[in-house]
C-alpha cells in the first residue's frame, strides 16, 4: 500500500508502478474534492479509516479487466483476508454502490448494509 487519496481511492505499487485504484461498489463522501464545498466531515472520517486499515499493509487486489471512466483501475481490495470494500459498507462509511451494476459479492454487501 502506498497512498490513500480518499475513502474509496488508493494508490498501490502494481507491476513496478504506482497505480490508482478505485474501490468497486463503494462511494464514500468527498474529502479531497477540488471544490472544497463538496468535502464533508464524514468523507474525512472515511479517508482516515481507509488510511488506518490499509497504509503499510500488503493488500490483495481483485481487478476488473478494464479501467473506469477516469482511467483508474477498478478493484476489490482485500486486507487481512477481508474484503475491504464490504468493510467500508459494514462500518457505515459508504452505501453499497450499485450504479454500474451489482457486485459478485452482492450477498456480502447486502448483509453489511443490514448491520449498519
Model-found features: residue ranges?
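Small beta-barrel nucleic-acid-binding modules, primarily SNase/OB-fold domains
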Residues: 1-116
Amino acid at each position: 500500500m502506498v497512498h490513500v487519496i480518499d475513502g474509496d481511492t488508493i494508490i498501490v505499487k502494481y507491476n513496478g508502478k504506482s497505480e490508482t485504484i478505485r474501490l468497486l461498489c463503494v462511494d464514500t463522501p468527498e474529502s479531497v474534492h477540488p471544490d472544497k464545498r463538496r468535502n464533508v466531515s464524514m468523507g474525512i472520517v472515511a479517508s482516515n479509516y481507509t488510511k488506518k486499515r490499509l497504509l503499510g499493509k500488503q493488500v490483495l487486489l481483485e481487478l476488473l479487466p478494464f479501467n473506469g471512466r477516469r482511467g483508474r483501475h477498478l478493484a476489490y481490495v482485500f486486507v487481512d483476508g477481508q474484503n475491504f470494500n464490504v468493510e467500508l459498507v459494514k462500518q457505515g462509511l459508504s452505501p453499497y454502490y450499485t450504479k454500474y451494476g451489482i457486485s459478485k459479492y452482492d450477498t456480502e454487501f447486502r448483509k453489511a448494509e443490514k448491520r449498519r
